[in-house]
Amino acid sequence: MAYLFLFCAIFVEVVATTLLKSTEGFTRLVPTLACLAGYAVTFTLLALSISRGMKTDVAYALWSAIGTAAIVLIAVLFLDSPVSVAKVVGVALIIVGVITLNLADAH
């Protein structure tokens, strides 16, 4: 159940972060409220994941890494963000870091 809460938290965080552009600097009410509500739900789900037994370091590493990778992908595909070697390398390093944390946790 902890992983379900975590992956729901990641999904909601990615949606909320994607909405940031549409808030236009928090000047548009509806997208701003949706974005803020999304972040509130995200942190609630993350807390539920941790309270259901997931270790905090693993939960946060997965949440931030998967969320970051998803946001970069969405930005490149849908928000006209340019692809660069630095972005690809950065996301790859994040993924390697999360795998390393999970492997270290298994031993």
UniProtKB/Swiss-Prot annotation:
Q: Name one GO molecular function term.
A: transmembrane transporter activity
| InterPro entries for the chain | Small_drug/metabolite_transptr (IPR000390), Small_multidrug_res (IPR045324)
Naming one, the record's GO cellular component terms include: plasma membrane
Give the main location: membrane
**Residues annotated as transmembrane:** 2-19, 29-51, 58-77, 82-104
Compartmental location = Cell membrane
Task: Please give the biological process terms from Gene Ontology that the record holds.
Answer: response to antibiotic
How does the entry describe its membrane topology?
Multi-pass membrane protein
Which of UniProt's keywords are assigned here? Antibiotic resistance, Cell membrane, Membrane, Transmembrane, Transmembrane helix, Transport
Function according to Swiss-Prot or TrEMBL: Multidrug efflux pump. Confers resistance to tetraphenylphosphonium (TPP), erythromycin, ethidium bromide, acriflavine, safranin O and pyronin Y.
Listed name of the protein: Multidrug resistance protein mmr
Q: Which organism is it from?
A: Mycobacterium leprae (strain TN)
